[in-house]
């Protein structure tokens, strides 16, 4: 099975606090993987390293690869990082859309990496690009809102526009950082259904950070759980039982309660 993401001995320190401890991780083509863990466990930090949004500690053994290309090593981004980012769709918790633009214009932003610079200056997109953008919106059930300003949409609708933008980008990997954290249950279900549909029918590898364990169990075949910057569990979601859940979350809560009491 083809390895899409490879992480070797990744460590990250923020202000003398070790956020990640020598993390090793391999993610294969077509997987949908949930990154779980309490707040501060390092799951979002790990996800940001995968696309090179942040770099790890300056250690020769620290390395991140995506689609066979180096993203970062020894605390430095690869010179051809733009190539890796072009293949990676990143979905943020707060959508990261341009409110003053229409839904269609926001989706077309996904084509900037493959559009000549002079065209981007004037927002001159080809008919074929506009057609692909409409197809992406159809895929996520948002084509009827194509010419509506994105600021008028609900949170769940905006997140689906962000997914359409990743499709427009023709990303081979989608990294989603807490994509349903601020959504109501029905909107969260629709967003997760959309990600699973893209994963299963397009073969796009999806890595998603979640706080909601029930969604991870329902939508992802594999769970990678982090605890205080260490990989605590990496395996089938079917084997992530109550004992593991208790050790991952409740022991952390007890430590926090004891600290407050002290």
UniProtKB/Swiss-Prot annotation:
Residues 5-253 form the ABC transporter domain. The keyword Cell inner membrane applies. The keyword NADP does not apply. One of its GO terms (cellular component) is plasma membrane. It is a peripheral membrane protein. It is found in: Cell inner membrane. Keywords: ATP-binding, Cell inner membrane, Cell membrane, Membrane, Nucleotide-binding, Phosphonate transport, Translocase, Transport. Its EC number is 7.3.2.2. GO terms for molecular function: ABC-type phosphonate transporter activity; ATP binding; ATP hydrolysis activity. ATP binds at residues 37-44. Transmembrane segments: none annotated. It catalyses: phosphonate(out) + ATP + H2O = phosphonate(in) + ADP + phosphate + H(+). Its main location: membrane. Part of the ABC transporter complex PhnCDE involved in phosphonates import. Responsible for energy coupling to the transport system. The complex is composed of two ATP-binding proteins (PhnC), two transmembrane proteins (PhnE) and a solute-binding protein (PhnD). Belongs to the ABC transporter superfamily. Phosphonates importer (TC 3.A.1.9.1) family. NCBIfam families: ABC_phnC (TIGR02315), PRK09984.1 (NF007438). This is Phosphonates import ATP-binding protein PhnC.
């Amino acid at each position: 099975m083809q390895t899409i993401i490879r992480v070797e001995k990744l460590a990250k320190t923020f202000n003398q606090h070790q956020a990640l401890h020598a993390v090793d991780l391999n993610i294969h083509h077509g997987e949908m993987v949930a990154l779980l863990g309490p707040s501060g466990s390092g799951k979002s930090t790990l996800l940001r390293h995968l696309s090179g949004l942040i770099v790890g500690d300056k250690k020769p053994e620290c390395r991140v690869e995506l689609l066979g290309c180096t993203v970062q090593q020894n605390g430095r981004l690869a010179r051809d990082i733009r190539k890796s980012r072009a293949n990676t769709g990143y979905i943020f918790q707060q959508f990261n859309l341009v409110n003053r633009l229409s839904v269609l214009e926001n989706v077309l932003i996904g084509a900037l990496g493959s559009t000549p610079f002079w065209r981007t200056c004037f927002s001159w997109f080809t008919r074929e690009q506009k057609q692909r953008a409409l197809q992406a919106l159809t895929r996520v059930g948002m084509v009827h809102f194509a010419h509506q300003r994105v600021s008028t949409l609900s949170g769940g609708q905006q997140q689906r526009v962000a997914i359409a933008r990743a499709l427009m980008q023709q990303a081979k990997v989608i990294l989603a950082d807490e994509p349903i954290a601020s959504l109501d249950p029905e909107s969260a279900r629709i967003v997760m259904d959309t990600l699973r549909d893209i994963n299963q029918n397009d073969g796009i590898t999806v890595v998603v950070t979640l706080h909601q364990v029930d969604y991870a169990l329902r939508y992802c075949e594999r769970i990678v759980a982090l605890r205080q910057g260490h990989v605590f569990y990496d395996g089938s979601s079917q084997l992530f039982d109550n004992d593991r859940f208790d050790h991952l979350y409740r022991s952390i809560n007890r430590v926090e309660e004891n600290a407050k009491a002290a």
